[in-house]
From Swiss-Prot:
GO terms for molecular function: DNA-binding transcription factor activity; sequence-specific double-stranded DNA binding. It holds the Pfam family Forkhead. Residues 119-146 are annotated as: Disordered. Transmembrane segments: none annotated. PANTHER family: FORKHEAD BOX PROTEIN R1, FORKHEAD BOX PROTEIN R2. Its main location: nucleus. This is Forkhead box protein N5. The lineage of its organism: Eukaryota, Metazoa, Chordata, Craniata, Vertebrata. It is found in: Nucleus. It comes from the Eukaryota.
Length: 295
């Protein structure tokens, strides 16, 4: 039985103490079920419980050979008050964080102190130089290195330098247009412009990056798409030759199939003038466009 109280302190002292000591245990022991299990409103089942009681008393060890009941010397107490948090502690209760200590200073004064501290930290972070000229000026004026000085200035400079490189890379990415070709056409272009018509995967990567600078800064996910097209497209097949890559690993060579050559030629001739203009802008050497694409 679990009891819930608004104020638990007076009842916490009752842990492991007995209650309801005037309960008639001699009558309780004669029952087949305890009184707390005999729910109210079950008068229709009284006869069945009475039969159980009679049967249990006939087999009771307290019954003597003459048929009279012996007085039971056992006087247990059925009601024991326990604190379940102490008897069976829950992990959440054990690992519960203790309450924070009460604040001695007034809340208004504490809020003012915190606001001053936060404003100081934010102002110190905003003091970092935001332009390249400011960064170069700070580095030029710092002629001597003092190990006693805090390193926040150097960390800011390093972070700003990295941020500027990322912005520069994004600018270069925007300056080069993405070629209006699918990955099968890019692979076919690389294979048909090789010396013997065969390349491994790394050589295909190098060809695409060299002639289309967009893929130099693009995320490396495009490489997975290239490998996927090599394995599952009917335009390519593995060659019988092998090449030793870096680390003396043998890498298989890929070549165009007859269907792949015909598909590439038809799709290139089907490009519109606008797409050809975008394709020329995306190439590092647009003068080689007619030679590379066979136009």
């Amino acid at each position: 039985m679990y009891l819930r109280f608004a104020n638990r302190k007076p009842y916490e002292k009752l842990h492991l103490s007995t209650a309801l000591e005037d309960w008639d245990m001699s009558e309780e022991l004669k029952l087949s079920i305890t009184a707390d299990q005999y729910f109210a409103g079950a008068d229709d089942k009284v006869e069945r419980y009475t039969l159980r009681r009679q049967h249990s008393t006939e087999l009771s060890p307290t019954r003597s050979e003459e048929g009279d009941f012996q007085e039971c010397k056992f006087r247990p107490s059925l009601w024991l008050v326990v604190d379940p948090n102490l008897v069976i502690p829950c992990p959440e209760w054990i690992n519960r964080i203790p309450p924070a200590p009460e604040l001695t200073s007034p809340p208004l004064q504490l809020q003012r102190q915190l606001s001053v501290e936060y404003s100081t930290v934010e102002d110190s972070e905003d003091e970092a130089p935001t332009s390249c000229s400011d960064l170069m000026t700070d580095d030029d004026n710092d002629d001597s290195y003092n190990p006693c000085q805090p390193k926040n200035k150097h960390k800011r400079a390093k972070c700003l330098g990295k941020k500027m490189r990322v912005q520069k890379g994004l600018t270069e990415l925007e300056s080069w247009a993405r070629p209006p070709l699918n990955y099968c056409n890019l692979i076919s272009l690389a294979l048909r412009n090789s010396e013997d018509g065969c390349l491994n995967v790394q050589q295909i990567y190098s060809f695409v990056r060299d002639h289309f600078p967009f893929f130099r800064i693009a995320p490396d996910g495009w490489k997975n798409t290239v490998r996927h097209n090599l394995c599952f497209s009917s335009s390519f097949e593995k060659s019988s030759g092998w090449v030793c890559a870096d680390g003396h690993r043998r890498s298989c060579l890929w070549k165009l199939t007859r269907q792949g050559r015909r598909k590439f030629r038809n799709e290139m001739h089907a490009l519109s003038d606008d797409l050809l203009h975008v394709l020329r802008r995306s190439m590092k050497k647009p003068a080689l466009m007619e030679l590379m694409f066979g136009m």
